[in-house]
Regions:
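Mature catalytic domains of secreted/periplasmic carbohydrate-active enzymes
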Residues: 1-180
């Protein structure tokens, strides 16, 4: 029997980076967790909470110290994952979500802290999935989820412009374009 993608909790699921997609499946563990914990609050409602916690707890200097003490030679930050939220105040506006990005430059702050300690800095950018452009909720196997990959020219232009912006602003030593 083929295992369903969201049929049971795992160490990295269901409350992690694919949360927005997973909560859209009504019978998934994530959807049940979300309903029990947050009611019917939409995913976008977490943006103010995230930004408030950032203002209180984000300490890129402490992160860089930890990486340096661990012997890291480089650090790669997820600058935009599949939910489309950017960790820098991008000049390239998301056409489907207003103000869908951090007002604080988390990428720049961590890049400066990492480089000040002699480590290299890289950026990860989800090129192949952005659920603010397309979220497929039919099916529950990984092959069905991959149908969420946006294929429009508007998305290609948007992603390209943001990647150019990342390169121009941060000069990453590593540029990781996921699923693209």
């Amino acid at each position: 029997e083929e295992m369903l993608f969201y049929d049971s909790p795992r160490k990295d699921l269901p409350y992690a980076d694919w949360y927005l997609n997973a909560m859209s499946y009504p019978d998934s563990v994530t959807a049940k967790h979300h309903a029990a914990t947050y009611g019917n609050a939409p995913y976008a409602d977490f943006k103010p909470v995230f930004e408030q916690r950032l203002s209180e707890a984000w300490d890129p200097e402490a992160w860089a110290d930890l990486f340096y003490k661990a012997g890291a030679k480089y650090v790669v930050l997820v600058t935009k994952h599949h939910d489309g939220y950017t960790l820098w105040p991008s000049a390239i506006a998301n056409p489907n979500r207003e103000n869908w990005g951090s007002p604080r430059d988390l990428v720049g702050e961590l890049a400066a802290a990492v480089r000040a300690r002699g480590m290299r800095f890289g950026t990860y950018y989800s090129t192949g999935l952005d659920w603010t452009f397309q979220l497929v909720t039919e099916g529950d196997r990984i092959r069905d989820i991959m149908r969420s990959a946006p294929s429009s020219q508007s998305y290609a232009d948007y992603a390209y412009a943001q990647i150019v912006e990342l390169i121009d602003r941060y000069h990453p030593d590593v540029l990781w374009a996921d699923i693209g």
